[in-house]
């Protein structure tokens, strides 16, 4: 008997990861409208995701130019993971 892999959907998680991956493409960051356009999503939909990502410190909002950028949290998580593994 062949086992088939079940595909599960987690749209909110995918949206958040899409935002993180997009922000990784530019050191200048993106405005909320640019993120929505690039990801083919509504501005309201992106707004909610951005607020959560900022509150969890995965991304930062620059009030001077109103652009979102990645924070160093992902780097810190990767570093923590690599130091916790024994060689």
Where are these regions (language model features)?
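N-terminal helix-turn-helix
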Residues: 2-84
């Amino acid at each position: 008997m062949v086992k088939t892999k079940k595909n599960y959907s987690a749209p909110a998680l995918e949206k958040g990861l899409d935002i993180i991956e997009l922000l990784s493409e530019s050191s200048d960051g993106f405005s909320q409208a640019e993120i929505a356009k690039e990801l083919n999503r509504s501005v309201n939909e992106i707004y909610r995701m951005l607020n959560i990502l900022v509150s969890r410190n995965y991304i930062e909002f620059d009030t001077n130019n109103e652009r979102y950028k990645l924070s160093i949290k992902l780097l810190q998580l990767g570093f923590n993971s690599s130091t916790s593994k024994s060689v």
